[in-house]
Every structure is written in structure tokens, then in C-alpha cells.
A protein has these predicted regions:
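Aromatic- and glycine-rich peptidoglycan recognition patches
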Residues: 40, 58-91, 101-151
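Loop/turn positions that initiate beta-strands
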Residues: 93-96
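N-terminal capping segments
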Residues: 1-61, 101-103, 114-116
Length: 151
């Protein structure tokens, strides 16, 4: 997890640009990031979603703002969603997003979430019930295949 990243391999140039862009969130954790995340694919919470959308499997490159997905934050992604509801009404649809103010994750079914949790934790699996999520949403810019999760 590195604030402001979206699935690209974190090299020195990208890290330096993120330190300049986010001096507190990235610069304040520079040593940890260099020791743990340098030369690995990194993403923040919404970057995990954007990175998959922007990834071009043919070229194996991340193309910013491609496939109709703009460069927006977690709260704007929630605001832009046309299909959403309170977390207690979440349908069992794989790939829905779960949201709380300032943070977003991906529902993978059966009460489980994948989320980019924080710089020192990274990307984790978590329990839907334990995350403090307030709402679910269909991620704008993604077409869903309505298939229910299986055990």
C-alpha cells in the first residue's frame, strides 16, 4: 500500500513523485515504504480498483485513465455510483465495492472483502462485518456479470 498509487511497480521515480505529491502520507513513511514496497506493485484503496481497470493485459502496462475509469478518489467513486445502498442491503454480487467515508474495498462474496488497508498492512482479506463499511455500490465504469457467489 502506497498512497496515490494504482498497481504499478513502485520504482524510485514513482516513489519520489508520491513523496512530493503526498509529503505526509508517503514522505512520513518513506523508510518503511522503501524497505517493504519498493519494486513491488502498490496501490491505495481506490488505486486497487483503478489499477485493475487501467491495466492492459496485452501490453502488461497500466494506462492511466483508460477503459472509461477516471482518476477519482474513493468518496467520488461512491458519489458517482448510480446503484448503491446501505451495507445491510448488500446483494451477494461478486466485485461490488464497499465504502465508508474515505475508504473503499472490493466485496468478493460470502462476507469477505479485499482492501488496500494501509501502508504498514498492505492489501488484505477482511470480514465484511468487521470493516465498519456503511454502504455498497456497483463501481461506475465497470459492467457486472450478475453471478452469485458460491461456497
Amino acid at each position: 500500500y502506497v498512497w496515490g498509487t494504482y498497481g504499478s511497480v513502485l520504482d524510485n521515480s514513482l516513489l519520489d513523485s508520491k513523496i512530493t505529491q503526498y509529503p505526509e502520507e508517503v514522505g512520513g513513511k518513506e523508510q518503511f515504504i522503501r524497505e517493504n514496497w519498493l519494486w513491488k506493485r502498490t496501490a491505495d484503496c481506490v488505486g486497487l480498483i483503478k489499477g485493475y481497470s487501467w491495466y492492459d493485459a496485452e501490453t502488461q502496462k497500466t494506462l492511466l485513465v483508460s477503459n472509461g475509469m477516471p482518476d477519482i478518489g474513493a468518496d467520488t467513486m461512491y458519489e458517482n455510483a448510480t446503484e448503491k445502498g446501505s451495507i445491510d442491503t448488500i446483494p451477494e454480487i461478486l466485485g461490488l465495492a464497499v465504502w465508508k467515508e474515505g475508504h473503499i474495498g472490493i466485496y468478493i462474496g460470502n462476507g469477505k472483502v479485499v482492501e488496500a488497508y494501509g501502508t504498514t498492512t498492505g492489501v488484505i482479506y477482511s470480514e465484511l462485518a468487521d470493516g465498519g463499511w456503511s454502504h455498497w455500490l456497483k463501481i461506475p465504469y465497470i459492467t457486472y456479470m450478475e453471478q452469485e457467489a458460491t461456497e
